[in-house]
Amino acid sequence: MNVITPPFADGVDPKPVCIVADDIFETMTARRKIHFSIYVIFKKNVELAEPFKLLYYTEKKNVAHLDGSVAQDFGLPMWTKDDGQRAPDLSRQKNDYIKLDFFTNINNPEDGFSYCWTDCISTKNTTMVPRQLMPPSKRSMKLYLILPVEESNIMVLSEKAYGSLQLMKKHRKMGQPPQRVGCYINFNCQTSKVMFGCGHVYCEQCLNSWNDKPCSVCLKPVTSEPTQLKLRQGPCPFDLCSPNSSTMGIVLIPCGCHVMCQNLEDAYERNKHHLEPLIEKIKYCPFEPCRIRVRKLKKPFWHQQDKEHTLEMNSA
């Protein structure tokens, strides 16, 4: 799934927080799902300072622009102190996970949602009775999951992607982690990324001060709105391939989902002057929360990292 780190205002001390930038409400109602699961997997030992939260946010604004303080301070806690021993453990170990299940009545979405959780820790592995979540006050609102942890410390997967990950582990087919997606102006910027029509990648923070300048790498004029990249986590959704350190992957247009697939990248290079058959073969975005019709393909280019900078597998 698409996990982003929100920007904080100047002078504010950033705290660990990230946003799962896939609208849970849209994922369920548009796809007519009655049940949707999210796995939050911890890649390091982490001490959670507070519960996960659910936040309604207006559709008219890009969630990538949501201030980190708002993401941290607002929203509905998914569990409280009153849950006592039934609440997920706040002390997490590497490879632990918390599974979140969401339910809705597709014939009457006005009834809202219900949700429950399951903690993989043996003493806590009890799924709660589903809790009701009221629908948004306006139809334009979207529902996001807020996590009180640094983006680099977790992997957030749909149930399908989690199953693919377990299959890869079973066959020991994990491969080398792909490169970190770095902004050409500020490599260490943690905010979400965008791609210009030329394929070069920048962060949202630098984009805000762009002022109609040409791309700083190729000097081509910026003639259209940049594509918001969705750097999804998990295995390759097409063939569970293992990308190498030179893999750039392919961005699907218009959804902006980045597919870290070496085989797709190779097919793109072979057919880049006649991509229509490849686009028709893909047809729809393969990621479960998206599934938007693919109209174009674009190979992205980002600032190369130093060897010590690596992230875990980004792709679903």
Curated annotation (Swiss-Prot):
Stretches annotated zinc finger (RING-type): 183-218
An individual GO BP term: regulatory ncRNA-mediated gene silencing
UniProt GO cellular component terms: RNAi effector complex
Taxonomic superkingdom: Eukaryota
Recorded phenotype for the gene knockout or disruption: Insensitive to RNAi-mediated gene silencing.
GO molecular function: zinc ion binding
Keywords from the UniProt entry: Metal-binding, Repressor, RNA-mediated gene silencing, Translation regulation, Zinc, Zinc-finger
InterPro entries xref list: Znf_RING (IPR001841), Znf_RING/FYVE/PHD (IPR013083), Znf_RING_CS (IPR017907)
Gene3D superfamilies reported for this sequence: Zinc/RING finger domain, C3HC4 (zinc finger)
UniProt subunit comment: Interacts (via RING-type zinc finger domain) with rde-10.
Biological role stated in the UniProt entry: In complex with rde-10, required in the endogenous and exogenous siRNA pathway for biogenesis and accumulation of secondary small interfering RNA (siRNA) intermediates, such as 22G-siRNAs derived from ergo-1 targets.
UniProt name for this protein: RNA interference defective protein 11
